[in-house]
Amino acid sequence: MDLDTKEIIKNMDLKFRNIDGKKLLLAISTDKDRNILMTAFMNEESLEKSIETGFMHYYSTSRNKLWRKGEESGNVQKIIDVFRDCDGDALLFTVEQTGWACHEGYMSCFHNKIDLNTGKFTVVGNKLD
């Protein structure tokens, strides 16, 4: 017997943190080779939508709303696996990425390498077409 989404989330024993007055947790998405694609926040509703649809949904703290990854660009993230960290306040999602993950056109949002001697950064990733 399959459980409903709320019961699944309850069984995950997550610790949503109070961030800007919202109950959120960190979501990290990687490809199947564990290359980090992006990080974002999730609230309970975005986690529910992700579980129900099989595609990543996040909570935007700047826009104060739920969003489905790729809703405008078509660059969706299909969920393959999910892992809970030891504290229960972060989730790691393995996803099948369509197109690029970064809104700037890079596969990963982590394409700026920082020089710790100067604090300046250099773009190390290539933009995708």
Curated annotation (Swiss-Prot):
Keywords, in A-Z order: Amino-acid biosynthesis, Cytoplasm, Histidine biosynthesis, Hydrolase, Magnesium, Metal-binding, Zinc
Family annotation (InterPro entries): PRA-CH, PRib_AMP_CycHydrolase_dom, PRib_AMP_CycHydrolase_sf
Catalyzed reaction equations: 1-(5-phospho-beta-D-ribosyl)-5'-AMP + H2O = 1-(5-phospho-beta-D-ribosyl)-5-[(5-phospho-beta-D-ribosylamino)methylideneamino]imidazole-4-carboxamide
E.C. number(s) listed in UniProt: 3.5.4.19
Enzymatic class: hydrolase
Pathway(s) per entry: Amino-acid biosynthesis; L-histidine biosynthesis; L-histidine from 5-phospho-alpha-D-ribose 1-diphosphate: step 3/9
GO molecular function, one term: magnesium ion binding
Cofactor note: Binds 1 Mg(2+) ion per subunit.
Cellular location(s): Cytoplasm
One GO biological process term: L-histidine biosynthetic process
GO CC term (a single one): cytoplasm
Known role: Catalyzes the hydrolysis of the adenine ring of phosphoribosyl-AMP.
The family this protein is said to belong to: Belongs to the PRA-CH family.
Name recorded for this polypeptide: Phosphoribosyl-AMP cyclohydrolase
Native organism taxonomy: Archaea, Methanobacteriati, Methanobacteriota, Methanomada group, Methanococci
